[in-house]
Amino acid sequence: VITDPIRKELISLLKNYGISDEFYFDNYNRLRANAYLMLDQIVMLMNRNPALRLEIGVHTDNAGSAAANLKVSQTRAQVMVNYLINRGIESKRLAAKGYGGAKPISHNTSESGRKMNRRIELNVIN
């Protein structure tokens, strides 16, 4: 059973480590050192909660082509999921989802808006 405290812990992880994908990836879609800290926290959370299933969603802004943005976001989501699998989390408990620029949370007319749209989301799968 997934409880509100688990959801709150996921939200807290993102608040502590940030949601910007720039925090997690370099220009070659490799994880930055900061990403490992957050992902290791997710491993511990998932080990404590064996029923927890998680989607890692990666979003981009609208710069570049929609196809390229979708590809890079899916690649980044899969890189994060692969790390969790390599740390012992069963693949059936994880989903990697690249959204590209399809779900903006801000406008794309300024750098600050685009930066908000380039983000990582952790979503509980029911």
Language model: regions and residue ranges:
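Periplasmic peptidoglycan-binding/tethering modules of Gram-negative envelope proteins
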Residues: 1-53
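Periplasmic OmpA-like peptidoglycan-binding domain that tethers envelope proteins to the cell wall
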Residues: 29-36, 57-126
